[in-house]
Amino acid sequence: MITFSFTVARPSVTVKADGALPSGITVLTGQSGSGKSTFIKCIAGLVKPTTGSIQYNETTWVDRGKKIWVPAQKRQVGYMPQGNIVFPHLSVEHNITYSKRGTPDMCNTLLQRLGLEKYRKTKAGSLSGGEQQRVALGRALYSKPTILLLDEPLSALDWNLRKQVREDLVSIIREWDVPCVWVTHDESEVEAVGDRHWICENGLITISE
């Protein structure tokens, strides 16, 4: 389980969070600029908290008081950023295996489960928006992460694609049984995908079951 108690001060917002992340899918909502992305970047190791700590089970990832800092590549976190999420000139296979922290068998499993086997050698930039989302999810899952962090995973899709891709993502996340934080500003996704709903308002994360 991920437990955390930290503050991160940034020019745009100060984020304060204190709690634990259980299994299942946690949907984190809030207005643009409220601190949602900063929160998951702290968990991922992409942003350093100003004060506080983050633990995974018995392992301390961050303790600012004790000057402990485990870098992102050693946390085994799957992170799917918002926006441009594939390397367009690399093949689908190379996109998924980019971190080099998984195995060929894992790549084969993901290609099959994500419906991407026939695109293995295809450049990712030539795929549809929904297919690119699946490639990005495959890359995030490739290292068998202890936690999956998705930042607005459906924002790049038009409304016609969102429902199907959302159902596919949720199905795979539950099948792999990996704790997930799903960041969105779309309130309709709360009931559609989440086991619980957290709210980020002016940098304060409100934890609820």
What does each model-found stretch correspond to?
Residues V62, P104-Y119, V170-S171:
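Conserved ABC ATPase "signature" region
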Residues L148-E152:
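Catalytic Walker B motif of ABC-type/P-loop ATPase nucleotide-binding domains
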Residues Y142-T146:
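A short, proline-enriched helix->beta-strand linker immediately N-terminal to the Walker B motif
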Residues D177-V183:
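Conserved H-loop
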Residues L137:
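Hydrophobic anchor residue at the start of the ABC signature
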Residues K123-L127, E131-Q133:
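Conserved ABC ATPase signature
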Residues W61-Y79:
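ABC ATPase NBD coupling module
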